[in-house]
From Swiss-Prot:
Pfam family, one: Ribosomal_L20
UniProt keywords, alphabetically: Chloroplast, Plastid, Ribonucleoprotein, Ribosomal protein, RNA-binding, rRNA-binding
Chief place where the protein resides: plastid
Protein name: Large ribosomal subunit protein bL20c
Gene: rpl20
Gene3D superfamilies in the cross-refs: 6.10.160.10, Ribosomal protein L20
Family as reported in the entry's similarity comment: Belongs to the bacterial ribosomal protein bL20 family.
NCBIfam families: rplT_bact
A single Gene Ontology CC term: ribosome
Keyword Cytoplasm: no
Function recorded in the entry: Binds directly to 23S ribosomal RNA and is necessary for the in vitro assembly process of the 50S ribosomal subunit. It is not involved in the protein synthesizing functions of that subunit.
SUPFAM superfamilies referenced in this protein's UniProt entry, alphabetically: Ribosomal protein L20
Originating organism: Vitis vinifera
Amino acid sequence: MTRTRRGYIARRRRTKIRLFTSSFRGAHSRLTRTITQQKIRALVSTHRDRDRQKRDFRRLWITRINAVIHENGASYSYSRFIHDLYKRQLLLNRKILAQIAISNRNCLYMISNEIIK
């Protein structure tokens, strides 16, 4: 059986992958085999880190809220604050509360004082 020449199809596939990895360093952007491996590895990393980013930001927001609450009253904790928020049916998520804690602490103090009552 005669050997078939792939022509432009294989070249087009390789250039598509090469464009994806053009910003990588060294052989990771030049050699076809390592390019395909690095592309798969990069996509795996981005998929994993999208979930990790959600976790990290949630931890950051909780830390910021907790720090501001502890400044206001030492006996009041973050978990009690969130519990009281839900009891009062205030629809403020952690992201918004963290932004309030950074930009306008007095507003967060007012919210926590209203909840405590």
